[in-house]
């Protein structure tokens, strides 16, 4: 039986840090389901379908990665896709409090699904989707080193019109 983990997020947009985390999680798990959240209450740069399409493009050559969108409870989506674990990244101590609370709630909802925390590779430790969006607003051309090429192309299309 293969070990499957789910990696949830808004991914608005997916960054090289996210991609690195998936690649590293594949050293632990046989398959990773990247689960793109509907982002309740957040104003997103890209709509759900576009975010899902970009991530599928990023991982198109990796048959060990499946990309899905979801709404509702993460643990229900994890069960639906046969995941035994939730993978989350911790960039800084400030991430821990929120992630610990989420992990505790997910464990209460389904104690069969474990949460695994991975720290980013050092070169990706300061990258976040929020920071990429903030930089892109002022100078989209500066975000190319932080996101996959297909994502940069979408950012360029969005901001070069302005």
UniProtKB/Swiss-Prot annotation:
ATP binds at residues 10-11, 18, 89-91, 99, 124-130. CDD domains: PPAT. Substrate binds at residues 10, 42, 74, 88. Transmembrane segments: none annotated. Gene3D superfamilies: HUPs (3.40.50.620). The record marks 18 as: Transition state stabilizer. It is found in: Cytoplasm. The keyword Nucleotide-binding applies. Its EC number is 2.7.7.3. InterPro entries: Cyt_trans-like, PPAT, Rossmann-like_a/b/a_fold. Keywords: ATP-binding, Coenzyme A biosynthesis, Cytoplasm, Magnesium, Nucleotide-binding, Nucleotidyltransferase, Transferase. One of its GO terms (cellular component) is cytoplasm. Its cofactor is Mg(2+). It is an enzyme of class 2 (transferase). GO terms for molecular function: ATP binding; pantetheine-phosphate adenylyltransferase activity. Its main location: cytoplasm. NCBIfam families: coaD_prev_kdtB (TIGR01510), cyt_tran_rel (TIGR00125). Belongs to the bacterial CoaD family. Reversibly transfers an adenylyl group from ATP to 4'-phosphopantetheine, yielding dephospho-CoA (dPCoA) and pyrophosphate. Homohexamer. This is Phosphopantetheine adenylyltransferase. The lineage of its organism: Bacteria, Pseudomonadati, Pseudomonadota, Gammaproteobacteria, Thiotrichales.
């Amino acid at each position: 039986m293969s070990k499957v983990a789910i990696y949830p997020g808004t991914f608005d947009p997916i960054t090289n840090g996210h991609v690195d985390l998936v690649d590293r999680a594949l050293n632990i798990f046989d398959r990773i389901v990247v689960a793109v959240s509907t982002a309740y209450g957040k104003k997103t740069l890209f709509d759900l379908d576009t975010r899902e399409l970009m991530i599928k493009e990023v991982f198109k050559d990796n048959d060990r990665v499946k990309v899905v969108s979801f709404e509702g409870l993460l643990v229900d989506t994890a069960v639906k896709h046969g995941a035994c674990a939730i993978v989350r990244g911790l960039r800084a101590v400030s991430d821990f409090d929120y992630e610990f609370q989420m992990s505790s709630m997910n464990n209460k909802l389904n104690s069969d699904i474990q949460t695994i925390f991975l720290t980013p590779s050092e070169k990706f430790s300061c990258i976040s989707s929020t920071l990429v969006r903030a930089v892109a607003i002022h100078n989209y051309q500066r975000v190319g080193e932080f996101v996959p090429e297909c994502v940069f192309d979408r950012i360029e299309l969005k901001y070069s019109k302005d």
